[in-house]
């Protein structure tokens, strides 16, 4: 084995000693030992340095895309925001204008034209928050603004966050949304639903169906007169934003033939299941013969290359990504993760490509079947490490990329004690894995794609979102030391692929503008 990259998802390094930091509170003898023995530094994982708007926290999709590309990749969120800014005459100075102004986007306009021609409504659907991981509320506001200018009858289906934002921030986001509706005279909220239902990505189709039934058939668990009331009444039932049960609002008429839908999430993984339902691209176990109404469904970005749907911002796939370079060099590689992070070490790491490269193997370990991961904070880390170790010892791959999901997924629950347990569980498996890589003659690279468990907030106000704190980078030679190398400061995720290729003796392509982290 030549090299293995281990991604500790959500493992940030918080410089503030006055916060509840599950990473710092955890007993992590292996991580601490590797940091002391190896070549260590920190990486920046947010803002323009990973292709996001300035100050925006990073996330797993962005992180893995940058890692695999070996360069800063302008993210879809920034592409959409910059196009909106151009429509408003507010384009940022570094805007590359690769997309048309938002109000002139032909795919988005086609949804409006379809509804107008058929006497229908345009339905705007997506996560309503400023979390910036899956959506921006300003993108919805721009759609409402466009509908107002055209005089188009529009409604909004608001998915509440509480995961990348405060658990009860939805009340304010919905109030802001209703203010925009009032200002532009259209886009009233028809349903409110927590992302737990509307944005499941773990094949829990019964959750997706509950969101679908509220949007399409007006069959919600609850009814509210106004959007904000849907949130406040949910809080009174001790149910926070992420878990708000599908609620119909006002005189919602459902989704009807002749209507159009714009799904405005820019991140794909948690938008796929509901898109499958609405686009009639269904799994065999859907459990219903009922077909969705005949509508025009537009997605903000490409959610799946197999979906035959119009896309407002088509993918701008980077070429010469890590997996491709390894494949062309005749190297074998293995990608490993449990269910929650499997798309990230495959699709996103490969620059938005579903199909594996020649010589690329993939192993997925099922995530635990629990409602929330604080109930099983070790998740499937032991089984994942077992799978990786067996593969290394029996197949001897040239390269490995593995993701431990625990600090991120448990950090999102806001449960401090569970997050500490999650970090400790990962540290235990990290030790086993690094020893195996070294025994196989490989270099080990340890990093994170963003922070999360490094700031858990307070007991009364838990922090469930990602952080903008630096994340670790550690290099270990096969003998478990720095091997005479030092790690430079000021690195980003785009520098990881060039580092790995250099250690493997492979020339990096010109498109990889990142630079090696060790020398």
Swiss-Prot record:
Mn(2+) 1 binds at residues 408, 412, 466. It comes from Haloarcula marismortui (strain ATCC 43049 / DSM 3752 / JCM 8966 / VKM B-1809). Residues 76-102 are annotated as: Disordered. GO terms for biological process: glucose catabolic process; glycolytic process. Its cofactor is Mn(2+). GO terms for molecular function: manganese ion binding; phosphoglycerate mutase activity. It is an enzyme of class 5 (isomerase). Pathway: Carbohydrate degradation; glycolysis; pyruvate from D-glyceraldehyde 3-phosphate: step 3/5. HAMAP family: GpmI (MF_01038). Residues 76-91 have a biased composition (Basic and acidic residues). The lineage of its organism: Archaea, Methanobacteriati, Methanobacteriota, Stenosarchaea group, Halobacteria. Its EC number is 5.4.2.12. The active site is at residue 60. GO terms for cellular component: cytoplasm. Belongs to the BPG-independent phosphoglycerate mutase family. It catalyses: (2R)-2-phosphoglycerate = (2R)-3-phosphoglycerate. InterPro entries: Alkaline_phosphatase_core_sf (IPR017850), BPG-indep_PGM_N (IPR011258), Metalloenzyme (IPR006124), PGAM_B_sf (IPR036646), Pgm_bpd_ind (IPR005995). Binds 2 manganese ions per subunit. This is 2,3-bisphosphoglycerate-independent phosphoglycerate mutase.
């Amino acid at each position: 084995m030549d090299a293995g990259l281990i991604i500790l998802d959500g493992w940030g390094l918080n410089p503030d000693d006055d916060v509840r930091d599950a990473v710092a509170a955890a007993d992590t003898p292996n991580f601490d030992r590797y940091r002391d023995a190896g070549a260590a530094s920190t990486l920046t994982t947010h803002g323009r340095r990973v292709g996001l708007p300035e100050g925006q926290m990073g996330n797993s999709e962005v992180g893995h895309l940058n890692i695999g590309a070996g360069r800063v990749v302008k993210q879809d969120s920034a592409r959409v925001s910059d196009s909106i800014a151009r429509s408003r005459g507010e384009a940022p100075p570094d805007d590359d204008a690769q997309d048309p102004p938002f109000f002139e986007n032909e795919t988005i306009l086609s949804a409006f034209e379809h509804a107008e021609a058929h006497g229908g409504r345009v339905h705007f659907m997506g996560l309503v928050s400023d979390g910036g991981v899956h959506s921006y509320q300003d993108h919805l506001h721009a759609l409402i603004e466009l509908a107002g200018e055209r005089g188009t009858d529009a409604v909004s289906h608001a998915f509440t966050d509480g995961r990348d934002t405060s658990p009860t921030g939805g009340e304010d986001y919905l109030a802001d949304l209703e203010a925009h509706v009032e200002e532009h005279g259209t886009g009233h909220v028809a349903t409110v639903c927590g992302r737990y239902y509307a944005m499941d990505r773990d094949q829990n189709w019964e959750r997706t169906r509950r969101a679908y039934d509220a949007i399409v058939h007006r069959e919600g668990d609850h009814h509210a007169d106004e959007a904000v009331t849907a949130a406040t009444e949910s809080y009174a039932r001790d149910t926070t934003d992420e878990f708000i049960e599908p609620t119909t609002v006002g005189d919602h008429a459902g989704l009807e033939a002749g209507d159009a839908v714009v799904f405005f999430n820019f991140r794909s993984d948690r938008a796929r299941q509901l898109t499958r339902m609405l686009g009639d691209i269904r799994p065999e176990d859907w459990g219903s013969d009922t077909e969705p109404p005949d509508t025009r469904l537009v997605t903000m970005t490409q959610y799946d290359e197999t979906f035959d749907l119009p896309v407002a911002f088509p993918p701008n796939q980077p070429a010469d990504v890590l997996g491709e370079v390894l494949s062309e060099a005749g190297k074998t590689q293995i990608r490993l993760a449990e269910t929650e992070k499997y798309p990230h070490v495959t699709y996103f790491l490969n620059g938005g490509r579903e199909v594996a490269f020649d010589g690329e193997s993939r192993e997925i370990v099922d995530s635990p079947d629990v409602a929330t991961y604080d109930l099983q904070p070790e998740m499937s880390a032991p089984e994942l490490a077992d799978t990786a170790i067996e593969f290394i010892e029996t197949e001897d791959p040239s390269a490995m990329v593995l993701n431990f999901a625990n600090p991120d997924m448990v950090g999102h629950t806001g449960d401090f004690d569970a997050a500490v347990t999650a970090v400790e569980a990962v540290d235990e498996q990290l030790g086993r894995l690094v020893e195996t890589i070294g025994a196989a003659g490989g270099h080990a690279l340890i990093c994170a794609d963003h922070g999360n468990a490094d700031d858990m907030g307070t007991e009364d106000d838990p922090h469930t979102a990602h952080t903008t704190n630096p994340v670790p980078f550690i290099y270990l030679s096969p003998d478990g030391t720095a091997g005479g190398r030092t790690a430079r400061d000021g690195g980003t995720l785009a520098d990881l692929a060039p580092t790995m290729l250099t250690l493997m003796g492979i020339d990096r392509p010109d498109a990889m503008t990142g630079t090696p982290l060790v020398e």
